[in-house]
């Protein structure tokens, strides 16, 4: 029954998606989604699935080698989004219980095994308010938000991906995968918030990244580099951090469960540029 959501089959990122509340809106939504999907991906194919009200976006990271070994490395939550595109990602999710983590991880591994998957990858789920979860899609690649998983597991996912491609076996057993601490990633986008968050290309004339214990920056930015109009505006800079205070960080194990987060560390980033950056709305 309704509501349902129409989605492009050839891509994501919020493109080619339309929520349909009733049968009266279905034809128009299909036409709009197809048109947008064709423009974005060169493929107008769409599909329809259940629309989950106010869901959490939770994804399970996996590694699968050529010898039939598959591991999951816990979850990332990517629920804070704008225009169906991720803004903040964290690991682990405060909404996922150990039992849910085990069940979702086991299902992710089973799904990868059914299709003989080999590589690093991510199984994405939607989680409703009752703790039910629904398969959404699989990303057959390393994702932008992979560093938060690296921060809490201590495992270099890109290195493992290269080892898998070289035909080597995974070096870990499932019971060796543990989550320590809490990591949050924030994307700084090349968008202009004063112009409806339109892409804002230009030259970065000066750039100074934040640093310190628990801070990691993944970026190609440098003073003098150009953010091209052809670049993805949402992939300019990623900043991950694993502490909210020295005492919390040094304790080694903690959980974040709050409505407000102090983003002081992000205030240390300095930009002098002809293009604008934003953390979201």
Residue ranges of model-derived segments:
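Short linear motifs in low-complexity or flexible loops
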Residues: 242-254, 264, 269, 274-278
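ATP-dependent carboxylate activation and anion-phosphoryl transfer catalytic cores
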Residues: 8, 13, 20-240, 253, ...
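Acidic/histidine-enriched active-site and ligand-binding environments that engage anionic O-linkages
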Residues: 1-5
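Low-complexity, glycine/proline/serine-enriched flexible coil segments
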Residues: 257-261
């Amino acid at each position: 029954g309704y509501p349902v959501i129409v989605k492009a089959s050839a891509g994501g990122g919020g493109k080619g998606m339309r929520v349909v509340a009733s049968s009266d809106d279905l034809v128009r939504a299909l036409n709009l989604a197809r048109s947008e999907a064709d423009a974005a991906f060169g493929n107008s194919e769409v599909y329809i699935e259940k629309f989950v009200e106010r869901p959490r976006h939770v994804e399970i990271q996996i590694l699968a080698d050529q010898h039939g070994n598959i591991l999951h490395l816990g979850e990332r939550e990517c629920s804070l989004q704008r225009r169906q595109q991720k803004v903040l990602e964290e690991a682990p999710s405060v909404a996922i219980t150990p039992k849910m983590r085990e069940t979702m991880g086991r299902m992710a591994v089973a799904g990868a095994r059914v299709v003989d998957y080999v590589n690093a990858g991510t199984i994405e789920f939607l989680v409703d308010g009752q703790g039910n979860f629904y398969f959404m899609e699989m990303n057959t690649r390393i994702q932008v938000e992979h560093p938060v998983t690296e921060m809490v597991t201590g495992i270099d996912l890109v290195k493992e991906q290269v080892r898998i491609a070289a035909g080597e076996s995974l070096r870990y057993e499932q019971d060796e995968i543990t989550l320590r601490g809490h990591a949050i990633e924030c994307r700084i986008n090349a968008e202009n918030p004063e112009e409806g968050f339109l892409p804002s290309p230009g030259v970065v004339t000066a750039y100074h990244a934040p640093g310190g214990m628990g801070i990691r920056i993944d970026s190609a930015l440098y003073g003098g580099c150009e953010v091209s109009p052809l670049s993805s505006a949402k992939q300019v800079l990623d900043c991950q951090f694993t502490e909210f205070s020295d005492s919390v960080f040094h304790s080694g194990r903690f959980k974040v469960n709050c409505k407000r987060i102090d983003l002081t560390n992000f205030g240390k980033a300095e930009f002098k540029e002809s293009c604008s950056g934003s953390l979201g709305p």
